């Protein structure tokens, strides 16, 4: 009961979780619309018999389940080979090849798969033997494909709005799901789903798993690469205009964390500065005993402050190995001139409430180390525990399960499978997900969805024959 209460409270509290569930529902609904409305849940036998075994084809073992198992294993072997090839490119720093691969895959879906779907839809509406209707079909295919393709380019390859990127993620994953439903023979889909379940566990959790190793090299790539492979439910962008209070709380939390990090950094820096100044005093005393600083010396601070921003000067470049008198004298004079310069002190500030926003912005922008100002990488984005992310493959296989459930012709089974997927996803993201590690989002939803589907089918057949 405590677990259920925790799940329900997290579902109520997190707008990211609710938006992710809504996106999954939209993805499954769009897949069903195309799968049923355009293709009438029929497999493309011409394409399917080229690559798979089935009793209705010439190439078959004669056993439906054995054919499905062989097809499923073969599909995962191909997936594994592609994954390890990509892993090799990543490990050996073939960054251009990796980016080109991801880019071409995205463009193929935006222009190729979408155009094929539009062709299959409009060819059923218009008579292809009539020239006028044939030309109308071409126009209705080309124009939407160009608009959709270039819209997707803007969404995936530029700094577009997050909602636009999410829309194209949902539609692209639906197109891929329908393509798989059209290619896989009837029972092959179930074997593919269950075998890919174990593959996902290996790829994400095993030390030599492809996704595990790729994450270790994520710091070599810009965070923009994630736009091509992951769905992000960014709460700050998501709630724009709809939940301003929650957004402001998130911004305030970010400011407080930044302030805390800044205080810790300059507290450590002050200790290093004290040690440095002590060395300077010793040098002065060794060269000229009369130059030993007194209590009025600028080197002695009347009141120590936990945070103090000092301008860097050339004396910081002095080392213990420097013994030249002229260099020491130069360092002393530079230090004295530096001490007379303007110093920004924030010793009395410890929380965000004690100063205005502009003062903290200046503090953070001017005082953080250079390493904190580097461009954000994919590793930084993946390690951000405040953003909920799902891989494109998760959306694809959720919809693949729903499409296969719809092929049974039982609406009750489809709804049950969808509820099972959503329940498994909620449990995965609330109970098993942690900020320290990546949690596979495919196994539990597939298990719950499959269980709910077959259970509902069993009860449906018992009740209605």
Swiss-Prot record:
<keyword id="KW-0221">Differentiation</keyword>
<feature type="topological domain" description="Lumenal">
    <location>
        <begin position="40"/>
        <end position="71"/>
    </location>
</feature>
<feature type="transmembrane region" description="Helical">
    <location>
        <begin position="19"/>
        <end position="39"/>
    </location>
</feature>
<dbReference type="GO" id="GO:0007286">
    <property type="term" value="P:spermatid development"/>
</dbReference>
<dbReference type="GO" id="GO:0048515">
    <property type="term" value="P:spermatid differentiation"/>
</dbReference>
<feature type="topological domain" description="Lumenal">
    <location>
        <position position="411"/>
    </location>
</feature>
<dbReference type="GO" id="GO:0005789">
    <property type="term" value="C:endoplasmic reticulum membrane"/>
</dbReference>
<keyword id="KW-0256">Endoplasmic reticulum</keyword>
<dbReference type="GO" id="GO:0061024">
    <property type="term" value="P:membrane organization"/>
</dbReference>
<dbReference type="GO" id="GO:0004175">
    <property type="term" value="F:endopeptidase activity"/>
</dbReference>
<feature type="transmembrane region" description="Helical">
    <location>
        <begin position="161"/>
        <end position="181"/>
    </location>
</feature>
<dbReference type="GO" id="GO:0006996">
    <property type="term" value="P:organelle organization"/>
</dbReference>
<keyword id="KW-0472">Membrane</keyword>
<dbReference type="GO" id="GO:0016485">
    <property type="term" value="P:protein processing"/>
</dbReference>
<feature type="intramembrane region" description="Helical">
    <location>
        <begin position="440"/>
        <end position="460"/>
    </location>
</feature>
<keyword id="KW-0914">Notch signaling pathway</keyword>
<keyword id="KW-0812">Transmembrane</keyword>
<dbReference type="GO" id="GO:0042500">
    <property type="term" value="F:aspartic endopeptidase activity, intramembrane cleaving"/>
</dbReference>
<feature type="topological domain" description="Cytoplasmic">
    <location>
        <begin position="93"/>
        <end position="96"/>
    </location>
</feature>
<feature type="topological domain" description="Cytoplasmic">
    <location>
        <begin position="212"/>
        <end position="389"/>
    </location>
</feature>
<dbReference type="GO" id="GO:0005794">
    <property type="term" value="C:Golgi apparatus"/>
</dbReference>
<dbReference type="Pfam" id="PF01080">
    <property type="entry name" value="Presenilin"/>
</dbReference>
<dbReference type="InterPro" id="IPR001108">
    <property type="entry name" value="Peptidase_A22A"/>
</dbReference>
<feature type="compositionally biased region" description="Low complexity">
    <location>
        <begin position="326"/>
        <end position="350"/>
    </location>
</feature>
<feature type="transmembrane region" description="Helical">
    <location>
        <begin position="97"/>
        <end position="117"/>
    </location>
</feature>
<feature type="short sequence motif" description="PAL">
    <location>
        <begin position="440"/>
        <end position="442"/>
    </location>
</feature>
<feature type="transmembrane region" description="Helical">
    <location>
        <begin position="137"/>
        <end position="157"/>
    </location>
</feature>
<feature type="topological domain" description="Cytoplasmic">
    <location>
        <begin position="1"/>
        <end position="18"/>
    </location>
</feature>
<keyword id="KW-0744">Spermatogenesis</keyword>
<feature type="topological domain" description="Lumenal">
    <location>
        <begin position="182"/>
        <end position="190"/>
    </location>
</feature>
<dbReference type="GO" id="GO:0034205">
    <property type="term" value="P:amyloid-beta formation"/>
</dbReference>
<feature type="transmembrane region" description="Helical">
    <location>
        <begin position="72"/>
        <end position="92"/>
    </location>
</feature>
<feature type="transmembrane region" description="Helical">
    <location>
        <begin position="390"/>
        <end position="410"/>
    </location>
</feature>
<feature type="transmembrane region" description="Helical">
    <location>
        <begin position="412"/>
        <end position="432"/>
    </location>
</feature>
<feature type="active site">
    <location>
        <position position="200"/>
    </location>
</feature>
<feature type="topological domain" description="Cytoplasmic">
    <location>
        <begin position="158"/>
        <end position="160"/>
    </location>
</feature>
<protein>
    <recommendedName>
        <fullName>Presenilin spe-4</fullName>
    </recommendedName>
</protein>
<keyword id="KW-0333">Golgi apparatus</keyword>
<dbReference type="GO" id="GO:0007219">
    <property type="term" value="P:Notch signaling pathway"/>
</dbReference>
<keyword id="KW-1133">Transmembrane helix</keyword>
<feature type="topological domain" description="Lumenal">
    <location>
        <begin position="118"/>
        <end position="136"/>
    </location>
</feature>
<dbReference type="GO" id="GO:0008104">
    <property type="term" value="P:protein localization"/>
</dbReference>
